[in-house]
Amino acid sequence: MWDELEELLIGADTGVSTTHKVLGEVQMRVEKERIKDGEQVKAILKEELVAILRTGGEKGRIWGEEEAPPSDRPAVILIVGVNGTGKTTSVAKLAQAYREDGEKVVVAAADTFRAAAIEQLKSWGEIVGADIVAHKQGADPGAVVFDAMSAAESRNADVVLIDTAGRLHKKFNLMEELGKIRRVIERKVPEGPDEVMLVLDATTGQNALVQAKAFAEVVPITALCLTKLDGTSKGGIVFAVSDQLGIPVRFIGTGEQPEDLTPFDAEEFVEALFQ
């Protein structure tokens, strides 16, 4: 049975280290509670997996009533991630979700490295009804963010979503760029962004953990958005990310449509692994 459970977890991209850690915890509980029934063992495993996903807690300032941003300014959400993860699409989906909640949204197209990202956001903006603030390709991302923050203030927006470039292979440039963006945000919001959300592609397996660690060295990640869960991927890598970095999952993306973004449910996610 233990081999079967190990195969299940590793097959779901949970990773060897996290798999062994979780199964070790389960074995200790099984021995302590003298459990013999296989279904009970699975139930304990599910409990341990859910607990891992909740270790990150509520790091951001906008997801609980007690830590909501002041009502006199927009909430600021910085979205980071490598190109190809569905980052820009996720920004549009978030804009759609906030619009459906009746919020006024301004999006900063600060991924000025890719012309496609700017045009993609402009197109999405028309579809979901969000205001897009964009400059030309190659423009200063900090200037885009400043203009977006100013526009949000003048238009009484509720939320500012900031799309950023994801060039991890040029780590110094990335650090410089994200550092500058944070400084621009802090000119308007001294405490910095309310949320820093990292978008990860569920199909990339262990590479997603490498990306998460790299971004966490550059900027304080407070949340994850897991994309491309509509394919064969089980997305088990989030257990390793949550376990090793203590970052909670906020959303999962399951398709290309604006509505294909749902709040993350730890119990449902764990149950899906066993189906």
Segments the model singles out, each with a brief description of its role:
Residues V80-G81, D163, V199, G253:
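Short beta-strand segments
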Residues A165-R167:
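Short glycine-rich anion-binding loops that position phosphate/pyrophosphate groups of nucleotides
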Residues I118-S123, Q137-R155, H169-Q275:
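Conserved catalytic-core segment of NTP-binding enzymes
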Residues M1-A110, A117-I162:
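Primarily NTPase-proximal linker/entry elements flanking Walker-type ATP/GTP-binding cores
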